[in-house]
From Swiss-Prot:
Residues 356-375, 396-422 are annotated as: Disordered. It comes from the Eukaryota. Gene3D superfamilies: 1.20.80.10, Phosphatidylinositol 3-kinase Catalytic Subunit, Chain A, domain 1, Pleckstrin-homology domain (PH domain)/Phosphotyrosine-binding domain (PTB). It is a peripheral membrane protein. GO terms for molecular function: cytoskeletal protein binding; protein domain specific binding. This is Band 4.1-like protein 5. One of its GO terms (cellular component) is ruffle membrane. It is found in: Cytoplasm; Cell junction, Adherens junction; Cell membrane; Photoreceptor inner segment. Pfam families: FA, FERM_C, FERM_M, FERM_N. Residues 396-407 have a biased composition (Polar residues). Residues 43-327 form the FERM domain. The lineage of its organism: Eukaryota, Metazoa, Chordata, Craniata, Vertebrata. The gene is Epb41l5. Component of a complex composed of PALS1, CRB1 and EPB41L5. Within the complex, interacts (via FERM domain) with PALS1 (via HOOK domain) and with CRB1 (via intracellular domain). Interacts with CRB2 (via intracellular domain). Interacts with CRB3 (via intracellular domain). It comes from Rattus norvegicus (Rat).
Amino acid sequence: MLSFLRRTLGRRSMRKHAEKERLREAQRAATHIPAAGDAKSVITCRVSLLDGTDVSVDLPKKAKGQELFDQIMYHLDLIESDYFGLRFMDSAQVAHWLDGTKSIKKQVKIGSPYCLHLRVKFYSSEPNNLREELTRYLFVLQLKQDILSGKLECPFDTAVQLAAYNLQAELGDYDLAEHSPELVSEFRFVPTQTEEMELAIFEKWKEYRGQTPAQAETNYLNKAKWLEMYGVDMHVVKARDGNDYSLGLTPTGVLVFEGETKIGLFFWPKITRLDFKKNKLTLVVVEDDDQGKEQEHTFVFRLDHPKACKHLWKCAVEHHAFFRLRGPVQKGSHRSGFIRLGSRFRYSGKTEYQTTKTNKARRSTSFERRPSKRYSRRTLQVKGEVWPCSTGSVHNASAQNNDSQQAWGMKSPVPVTSFSSSGPVLVETENLPQNSAADQHDRKRLPLSIDLLNSPDLLETTIGDVTRPSDTSAPFPAPDDVNVATMSHELEELRADCETLKDDTEKLKQLNTEQNILPSLRPAIDINVNSQEEVVKLTEKCLNNAIESPGLNTVRVPPDFKSNILKAQVEAVHKATREDSLLTHKNASVQDAATNSTVFNENNMPLCKDSLTPVHGTTADSDSVLKDATDELDALLLSLTENLMDHTVTPQVSSSSMITPRWIIPQNSTISNGLAGYGVSLTGTEGCNQKDGFSLISPPAPFLVDAVTSSAPPLPGDSALKQKCLLTTEL
């Protein structure tokens, strides 16, 4: 009596009871169902649901499997419960379905807590027979797990469609502002999920816009039911030859696979006997021979463990009863007291026929769809086709301009950006910000040696295009409005005027270098070089170095030079006059220069109307051209050393007694102002200082004269140009 009281009321027994309570509390999941009632002995079962959540249930110690199953179905509010079951693993790692007629403790040996998993036990041969939306949702979750684990093999196209249905059911309609292709990588649909598949899933998802979650899940099931291994319960066995085979339990019968090849199908009506003994499973099938007589064929399969053999037999009995019978087999009332042969297991649930005929869908059901597990997002390497920008190739100009470069005896150190097209081309443009220090720095660093007018289909080429490093992805500066008709008419008149000046071509060689700058005002035509209206400077040091180069004597002086210091030019024009005797001599020199340049350009440079960008232009007769040229040249030569300031180093003075002006042109450089038929090639020594760059100079409009400044008033657009540096000559 004292020992009994000591065991019951002692401190040791009380501590053991408290430890059990703490252990039970720790084993409980977030969702707990207390179903033990007033039972003193309680067991805790933890069930993992298809959506990934866990539910813990407290039951009496001697509770059977059906009680736990009913608690789970009640918690889920699931009516079509006959398609599902609770599965557990034994000590031999063999999966078993919980038998509702037996005690939980006798079946599940590993506990407490006793861990079980809710799974689909019988896959409906026709998903449209599933009446409840919740049932279809759970079927979709089960099929997702089967495909992801590799149990259910799925082709690429089918896997893409099924995954797209999953996204539509979980995320809804595709939204361009919210969803990106990388979003698909956060989900897992197949064991080997590639980037190509994710992009295909993303595109397929867009096609399913407008489907509700219920519709997407129904379409998912209707697509998945056509998979070859849909609803097949596979079990690995060995035959008498020692090779491994697989038996697949289906609604229609038993499939036999050798590896992945299906070699036989035993229909349920043809199977007359199915039993097991230890680890051997015997299958007797009746087939008709050639003469129409029935013959029995016996197949014996071996399994690794007797429990696995019994599990396969029980699954075959349940599949046969669920899909083939109208109702479950009634158990016999009498039992043999001493002798019992075979197993007493019989399927006790409803059949598919009973489930589809008796169950009726409820008017309204509500349940919560839980989101899928997310993973880290992948950075996609392929994002579809990348359309190239509308830019010219930087590798074509070198090959196209080889002839002109060989004629002038120079090479182009940088690639040239050009276009080759048979007609007008639309180019996306980008206006660069004014006074860009970085752009000016890049222009000053790169040598300027480009001959772009050799291409007949050349578009407008700006100084920014010439000096900027070759980059096919960068947009071109914005071209001005093109008036091709006006410029073509002006060019024809210029060529006609220059025909009268061909006799004086040899007189230009007699001009020597002058000390100061000889500006050239161009009142008729003004070509906007770029959006900043900036002109690259040409330093006097570079000019002085160039004049000492022996290769300079062979260079012709073209007329398309332009000085951007218009203010100094206007002051030089109105400041002084010159004697008439000097005008005649200079006029002949000017005519010689214009004729020589025009003839050269007509012979070498093709006309491209699309590349011209005139602002304004005027025409004049040849007589007025010569008269204006002589007057302006006289005024400039008189005020040459008085009004123009030289901000560079003091130039060297030549010892020549005869003062004859000659242009100083940098070597190894080629400048194009964008006018077809007028190209300028500048050649200078490599050691020339190019810190301030070069000045791009355009040809005067009504006349083609060298070193001539018009006395016409400047245009409003020209007055806005900033004074960069003076183009100097050396005496």
